[in-house]
């Protein structure tokens, strides 16, 4: 059976029945430092919208997945994206069939100008394919890598104006965007 896609333009447009259905899901979110900011943002949205009743818990313990939960925990180490992918698969294998939705995010510091983007992406892609095959009832969600801010100095502006292609100040974001395009 094909899932029906519904698009809402604002949180207030989402009916209470949809929030109730979501609250019954077993969700896992793997992250590092910035993920806590995302969880803070979700909690802020919940405070402003009483119909949202997500049970947000910092855990990756299978015993916490016997009812609806939005669980989250740290995965891997910052600046080592493959460690995050490897930690995520270990957690999902530990949780087995206890989850409905699972995802993790890389941090903006995980990709820099020296990163082999194809290697990182291929490791991620292979890992996610294994998980999808092993846990076909779990919906895996994919996230792009956030871009960082770059201080545009006079020197950087001049490089841009003269059409210089290799501007190291922008290289990290270029690599992140390359990854995002692969995704």
List each language-model region with its residue ranges.
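N-terminal module-boundary/linker segments of secreted carbohydrate-active enzymes
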Residues: 1-52
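Alpha-helical scaffolding within the catalytic cores
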Residues: 10-14, 82-93, 125-127, 146
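Loop/turn elements at helix/coil->beta-strand transitions in domains of secreted/extracellular proteins
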Residues: 23-26, 50-55, 97-102, 133-141
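Soluble non-cytosolic domains of exported or imported proteins
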Residues: 32-36, 82, 114-122, 170-177
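Conserved SGNH/GDSL esterase-like catalytic core that processes O-acyl groups on lipids
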Residues: 34-115
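A structural motif
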Residues: 95-100, 135-162
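Generic structural signal for well-ordered alpha-helices
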Residues: 124-129, 180-183
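Substrate-gating cap/lid alpha-helix
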Residues: 150-183
């Amino acid at each position: 059976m094909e899932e029906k896609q519904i698009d809402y333009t604002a949180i207030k447009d989402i009916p209470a029945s949809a929030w109730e259905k979501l609250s019954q899901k077993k969700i896992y979110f793997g992250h590092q430092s910035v993920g806590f900011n995302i969880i803070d943002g979700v909690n802020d949205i919940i405070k402003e919208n009483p119909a949202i009743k997500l049970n947000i818990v910092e855990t990756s313990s299978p015993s916490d997945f016997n009812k609806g939960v939005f669980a989250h925990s740290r995965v891997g180490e910052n600046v080592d994206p493959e460690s995050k992918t490897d930690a995520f698969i270990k957690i999902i294998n530990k949780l087995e069939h206890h989850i409905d939705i699972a995802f993790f995010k890389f941090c903006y510091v995980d990709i820099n100008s020296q990163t082999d983007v194809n290697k990182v992406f291929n490791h991620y892609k292979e890992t996610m394919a294994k998980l999808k095959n092993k846990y076909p009832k779990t919906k895996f969600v994919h996230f792009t890598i956030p871009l960082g801010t770059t201080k545009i100095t006079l020197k950087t502006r001049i490089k841009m104006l003269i059409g210089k292609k290799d501007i190291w100040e922008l290289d990290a974001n270029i690599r992140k965007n390359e990854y995002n395009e692969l995704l």
